[in-house]
Amino acid sequence: MMSVPETPSHAAPQATFETLTAERIAELVAIERLAYSHPWTARNFADSLQAGYNCQLLVAGATLLGYFVAMQGVDEVHLLNITVAPQAQ
């Protein structure tokens, strides 16, 4: 019979999704500048929030790992931005 390995006490925090708030836009802009030669601006993210787009952050504890911005269509979803922080790639 095989046993399930125990999770080490030093295991990384579980990654979860959180909804983007305006207060966290500066964090995304910093990652955009590291990840892309033509990054989104703070205004792009603010406009996406105002338009009601689905803006989600992937976090592990206090660490921002990545994010996406998606626009719901009739029977589809348009992925407008998806980014993994360079340090998490």
Where on the chain are the PLM-derived regions?
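Acetyl-CoA-dependent GNAT
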Residues: 2-89
